[in-house]
């Protein structure tokens, strides 16, 4: 593992109790950052904290509640100091269904978590980063946001919007020492697969030229550099993690 110095940094990782979020948290912790995990699942948070070590902070928070996000940030900074790194990993896939049959309630839920939640967290952490003239933000989108997956319109739309949000915010903050980027992973071996049909999972796998799914540690390796001081120029950009599937 390449060593990236994140000493003195305080990172918030949403969706940090499992999957890519947990892998990112472990990598940032190993690189010297203090880490606070945000997740809705209190039980999984405790397991993740035990895996990372006693110094890891946790906050049970619903990122679809803008006020709850602000309060969680206050508690996080009171316990661990100013947040200089934010990785938005919380998200859901939603059901597989054609658009004309897609449940409106599910549509709203997917958009609320994947897009609105990412907006609320970014909106909360940005003022402090601007005041300190430093910050690193990575929003986790998806290859589906670039190419669209059939029978996954809500997920594809939400992740495309995260890419747009990232590009807009990165340009807004370009005059500060704040980098805002996103990554677009192909399918990874995480619990999000439990929300999908076997047929849809195979549809995604065969479209990856590497011939396999993304490993969560591979995503964490890229993100660790993006949130480091070494990433001093690149912002408002999208980094591909699709194993060759992306066409642009």
Predicted features and spans:
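Residue(s) in the substrate-gating loop at a strand-loop-helix junction
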Residues: 142
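C-terminal substrate-recognition "lid" of short-chain dehydrogenase/reductases
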Residues: 119, 134, 178, 212-241, ...
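Catalytic Tyr-X3-Lys loop
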Residues: 84, 100-119, 134, 138, ...
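Alpha-helical segment proximal to the catalytic Tyr-Lys
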Residues: 127, 171-175, 232
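The beta1-alpha1 cofactor-binding region of Rossmann-like NAD(H)/NADP(H)-dependent oxidoreductases
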Residues: 42-43, 60-72, 104, 217
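Active-site helix of classical SDR
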Residues: 122, 158, 166
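Short C-terminal tail/terminal secondary-structure segment
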Residues: 1-5, 93-96, 147, 224, ...
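Substrate-binding pocket helix/loop in short-chain dehydrogenase/reductase
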Residues: 97-99, 103-111, 193, 200, ...
């Amino acid at each position: 593992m390449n060593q990236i110095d994140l000493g003195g940094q305080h990172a918030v990782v949403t969706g940090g109790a499992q999957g890519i979020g947990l892998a990112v948290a472990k990598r940032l912790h190993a690189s010297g950052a203090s880490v606070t995990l945000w997740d809705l699942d209190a039980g999984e948070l405790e397991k993740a904290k035990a895996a990372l070590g006693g110094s890891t902070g946790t906050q049970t928070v619903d990122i679809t509640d803008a006020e709850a996000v602000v309060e969680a940030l206050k508690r996080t900074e009171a316990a661990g100091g100013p947040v200089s790194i934010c990785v938005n990993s919380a998200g859901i896939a939603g059901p597989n269904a054609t658009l004309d049959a897609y449940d409106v309630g599910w549509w709203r839920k997917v958009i609320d978590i994947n897009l609105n939640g990412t907006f609320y967290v970014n909106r909360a952490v940005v003022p402090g980063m601007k005041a300190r003239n430093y910050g690193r933000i990575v929003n986790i989108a998806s290859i589906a946001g670039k190419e669209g997956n059939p029978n996954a319109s809500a997920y594809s739309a939400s992740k495309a919007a995260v890419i747009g949000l990232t590009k807009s915010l990165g340009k807004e903050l370009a005059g500060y020492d704040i980098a805002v980027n996103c990554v677009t992973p192909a399918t990874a071996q995480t619990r999000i697969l439990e929300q999908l049909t076997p047929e849809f999972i195979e549809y995604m796998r065969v479209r990856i030229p590497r011939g396999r799914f993304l490993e969560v540690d591979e995503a964490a390796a890229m993100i660790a550099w993006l949130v480091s001081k070494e990433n001093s120029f690149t912002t408002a950009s999208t980094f591909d993690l699709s194993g060759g599937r992306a066409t642009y």
